[in-house]
Amino acid sequence: MRTHYCGHLNKSLAGQTVELCGWVNRRRDLGGLIFIDMRDREGIVQVVVDPDMADAYEVANTLRNEFCIKLTGEVRVRPESQVNKDMATGEVEILAKGLEIINRSDVLPLDFNQKNSEEQRLKYRYLDLRRPEMSDRIKLRAKASSFVRRFLDDNGFLDIETPVLTKATPEGARDYLVPSRVHKGSFYALPQSPQLFKQLLMMSGFDRYYQIVKCFRDEDLRADRQPEFTQIDIETSFMTADQVREVTEKMVREMWQELLNVDLGEFPVMPFSEAIRRFGSDKPDLRNPLELVDVADLVKDVEFKVFSGPANDEKGRVAVIRVPGGAELTRKQIDGYAEFVGIYGAKGLAWMKVNDRAAGVEGIQSPVAKFLSEDVINGILDRTQAESGDIILFGADKANIVAEALGALRLKLGKDLGLTKEGTWAPLWVVDFPMFEEDDEGNLHAMHHPFTSPLGVTAEELKANPAVANSNAYDMVLNGYEVGGGSVRIHNAEMQAAVFDILGIDAEEQQLKFGFLLDALKFGTPPHAGLAFGLDRLVMLLCGTENIRDVIAFPKTTAAACLLTDAPSIANPAALEELAIAVTAAKAKDAE
């Protein structure tokens, strides 16, 4: 039906007759001529309909926005004075010879000339995707996927599919369960990742595997999370952690170079402990110059218990952020930041304005200065390298609360005060994560997943002191987002059983949930390591947006609902009966 895309037309086609298919983006009448901005997925071109072309002119008179049309016309170069430099096709226009309405359109429920609500955009997503901005994002996603496949194919990786209906295993979030009709009372789980299957593929001898795969997690949603998401899944045998990082870093660097013409440079490597200490986060945004500075040793002996309490607690922390120029913050703004850190468990936000550094204590304005000696204040000023006009913000509590609260405050201050260097890129690797993390009850949980190998310890050493062990894991971070995470995997049954024991998974449960894996580990398992990228998050960054819904064709809401199809929906009672399932929640709701 078409010979060209609208957005591909240029001066080299002058004089040629082309056939185009697309939509009316805009129609206007000027001096007897009708001008149509015609749009398809590749762009917009201006069409001129002259009254001399009577049939085409008659049709053009009836056109309205979003009519689907077919056009036959001649490409001609615009006069220099009429060139539109804001359009990719602005040097040419099409003189209409034939015009056909393929389909008419009702008035759209979306207004492309103004901001529509998120709800309206998701309900009429097929219309929202017609907008050039959205179309460009989906096309960039396609290019990113294509690049990944080419890169991994060229580097010897095999694209192998893994099951979607599988067994529930503990991977950190709730599973989406699928009832079995044949095995009544039993359920499949949709995979949170292909983790175990890709490890089994390594045991099968496929030493370089990849897959661009859908994964599912039933968890509370955020702007950068969806219940179903796409993962670039990678696994290798006989490669070290350094080698895995090298090849995956190369992939991301070349992707940015090809798609954005941006050189990310070599990625720095930072231990987890340093990231938490300096930035309060294991995914620090290095575009932001603010850092956390520990001052617990300076305030251990002060009478102010808010500081000295955490300073003398082995699980406590006292840290500060020096904000250049922050002395200009009003009390109302500071109170707003105090309320903000409260979201993360902080009980308040002490502050110290440095009005005149040369004046020492006399140049300080702070509600807590009266509780601190001159030596302590000067020590804090010296350590933070404070200057006149700065403000110092304090966090004092359990170490994890201080890290989370000040880490989040650091990001907010960076944006609010224009300190974060927008439009730049700051990648890094974070390595040497703790093997386990402790919950409020003192129980240990795997920081990544229970198949991650510890770093440099035997099974006996790990069992003797699990709380201090590090894992051979690594995360790729870009502009404060974790875009990929991976690890060296456990490849012998003894170590795997030891990790399960530490996590409180007894021998019976190990066999019930992971018997197939423990058996497989007995048959000459090679050392293996891998990494998985979130494709949605990578594309979100490539597109310069802050919400992954912007780069998914048909996303869910933050309530995990599809406004377009009204999913999830109530199941047919006959289907539920066949599955031997009774929906007690619905019955209870009906009874109310």
Curated annotation (Swiss-Prot):
Q: Which residues does the annotation say bind L-aspartate?
A: E171, R217, H448, R489
Residue ranges of the region described as Aspartate: 195-198
Organism superkingdom = Bacteria
Leading EC class? ligase
**List of residues binding ATP:** R217, D218, E219, Q226, E482, G534, L535, D536, R537
Q: Name one GO cellular component term.
A: cytoplasm
Known EC number: 6.1.1.12
Which keywords has UniProt assigned to this entry? Answer: Aminoacyl-tRNA synthetase, ATP-binding, Cytoplasm, Ligase, Nucleotide-binding, Protein biosynthesis
> Its principal location?
cytoplasm
Q: Where in the cell is it found?
A: Cytoplasm
Entry's family note: Belongs to the class-II aminoacyl-tRNA synthetase family. Type 1 subfamily.
Q: Which NCBIfam families match?
A: aspS_bact (TIGR00459), PRK00476.1 (NF001750)
State the protein's purpose. Answer: Catalyzes the attachment of L-aspartate to tRNA(Asp) in a two-step reaction: L-aspartate is first activated by ATP to form Asp-AMP and then transferred to the acceptor end of tRNA(Asp).
Q: How does it assemble?
A: Homodimer.
| Name the UniProt record assigns to this protein | Aspartate--tRNA ligase
Gene expressing this chain: aspS
